[in-house]
Design a protein with these regions (language model features):
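Subset of outer-membrane beta-barrel
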Residues: 1-190
Length: 190
């Protein structure tokens, strides 16, 4: 899957985001177990100072079949990789410059990188005999390694872990129509 988006083009140097995601399914062991291997690559650039974020995050997931007769899986997944953020300090304008002063900011670095990691688990199953009726529930813990997240090299500023809980239900109404309900809840920081 590939996605590209321009946002707010009437603003100087609008947001430009590109993303490529891929996942490959491979059977493993007996019964219906399988693993998926994938990656998420994201590039985002915004604003006059060219604030840019790049993510390269490979993923590995194991899906354990809990029934040979029904579609029931318990899944465990890991995603982690490299993230970089940067900007062009020559394009920064601060209030000190309007008063005849210099930049007024002490940027030791105009870029930084870190390793980020996430883990998640989900359960999905058919409802009844119809394989088109199903549900899922899951949870994920993002940024479990608490990477440092700032341009000033301040060791106390970190990306706080985030919990995400998800659930969904799909039920057939007719042979050609379904009702789908999904919900997510996330919590990050304190």
């Amino acid at each position: 899957q590939a996605v590209y988006r321009d946002q707010w083009n009437n603003v100087t140097n609008a947001y430009r985001t590109g993303s490529v995601n891929a996942e490959f399914k491979m059977p493993v062991g007996k019964v219906n177990d399988f693993i998926t291997v994938g990656a998420q690559i994201l590039y985002d650039r915004a604003g006059t100072i060219s604030f840019t974020t790049t993510h390269i995050l490979p993923a590995l997931n194991y899906h354990k079949s809990l029934s040979s007769e029904h579609n029931r899986y318990l899944s465990l997944g890991f995603m982690g990789g490299w993230v970089q953020r940067r900007f062009d300090p020559s394009k920064v304008t601060t209030n000190s410059q309007y008063d005849g002063g210099g930049l007024g900011e002490n940027f030791l670095n105009s870029q930084y990188s870190y390793i980020d990691g996430s883990v998640g688990m989900s359960y999905n199953s058919n409802i009844g005999a119809d394989p088109n009726n199903n549900f899922y529930i899951g949870g994920a813990y993002h940024h479990f390694n608490r990477p440092k997240n700032n341009f000033y090299r301040n060791a106390t500023i970190e990306l706080h872990p985030k919990w995400v809980f998800s659930g969904g239900l799909r039920m057939g109404v007719t042979d050609f129509a379904y009702i789908t309900v999904q919900a997510d809840h996330s919590r990050q920081g304190g």
